[in-house]
Amino acid sequence: MGLLDNLLSAGSGAIVTQLTKQFGITGDQATSAISTMVPALAGGLKEKLADSQASSSISQLLMSGGLNSFADNPSSLGSPSALAQGKSLLSSVFGGEDLTKLASGVAEKTGLGSGIVNSMLPVVMTLLGGFLSKNVASGKTSLMDLVGNLAAGPGILGAVKSLAQKVTG
């Protein structure tokens, strides 16, 4: 079972269930959205972690904000705290243009509306942050190894370009 499968099956599928309730989508749509978003979000994190200037602030956001509690309690993903942490991570990792392209690509690939995708991105980023934080805290792996394993190809720029090509294509 891969890391993405571990994330999706955490809590016996409670994450997918929470997203279906929170956004009024089906389980298949939630799974598709997570499966599309996580590699691209991880790619952005991977690029930021490789940048020595940004690495420490991103690591601090991931490891000091209590994010692992969201991995353990998916029902809290809709809380104001979860949304605030997800938005903070997103703004630290992506510029506005890259985030807009990512959201458009995810909407196109999953068939979800752009409003739902834009609302889901901070929640999925919080989920990803919690998953990373929890696994790194266990001491079994490094943040960069986890992010690298979850990232799609060459990172966010490649993911955004690939998604943009599919949208405009």
Where are these regions (language model features)?
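A structural "flexibility-hinge" signal
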Residues: 1-169
